[in-house]
Regions:
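A short alpha-helical cap/connector motif
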Residues: 1-147, 157-202
Length: 202
């Protein structure tokens, strides 16, 4: 019940940003409409609900976003930073079976981090929650990932520090188009498109 109350409050605050309304860019509109807020009941959702147990509703919602993003991006690699379960891996691989899974943990050395970021390949997805030494990790990602990559930053509204950091990333010269989904932020590194930041009622 508490989840639904919080979700409703967030929805009310962002109601004017629903479904891509008011977005001028055709590409951004399609991404919001058909990836972020796509409500089509993919047949795999039911299978994944049975396969992935023990996660809360918000995590399930984000997992489904990762599924759709993987289906859209068709990433060569999904680099998962500080995973606490295999749920994101399972949903990403369901969205794109060819995706190679890699992870960064507390035990991963700096040398290995650089190697992983440098070798992810084109159109890859990188998940970074704002925990541990996230600033250093994001900086390495921005320096070494190919421009076709997309980074998902989780916990961007956790506290004022996280919100301020997200604002920094949106303005960073190394980032391209970004989407503030409240529960997470999505950053594309392709700078061929006009840089813009969108707030989306996800």
């Amino acid at each position: 019940m508490l989840y639904f109350i919080r979700r409703f409050i967030v929805w009310l605050r962002r109601a004017r940003y629903s479904r891509g309304f008011g977005v001028q860019s055709p590409w951004a509109y399609r991404f919001i409409r058909y990836v972020v807020n796509e409500h089509y009941p993919y047949y795999k959702y039911e299978q994944l609900d049975e396969q992935v147990n023990g996660i809360d509703k918000r995590t399930r919602k984000i997992c489904k976003l990762y599924f759709r993003l993987a289906n859209y991006q068709q990433p060569r690699t999904f680099l998962d930073c500080y995973p606490t379960s295999s749920c994101y891996k399972i949903y990403v691989n369901a969205g794109c079976q060819k995706t190679h899974y890699q992870k960064i943990t507390k035990e991963t050395t700096e040398e290995d981090c650089l190697r992983l970021f440098s070798n992810v390949g084109e159109y890859s997805m990188v998940r970074i929650p704002l925990i541990e030494d996230y600033r250093s990790l994001v900086d390495k990602a921005l320096e070494h990932l190919p421009s076709s990559s997309v980074i998902i930053i989780e916990n961007i509204k956790r506290n004022k520090e996280a919100e301020a950091y997200w604002t920094e990333l949106v303005s960073d010269s190394r980032t391209g188009i970004s989407f503030d989904l409240y529960y997470c932020g999505v950053i594309f590194l392709n700078k061929d498109m006009v840089k813009q930041s969108y707030v989306v009622n996800f």
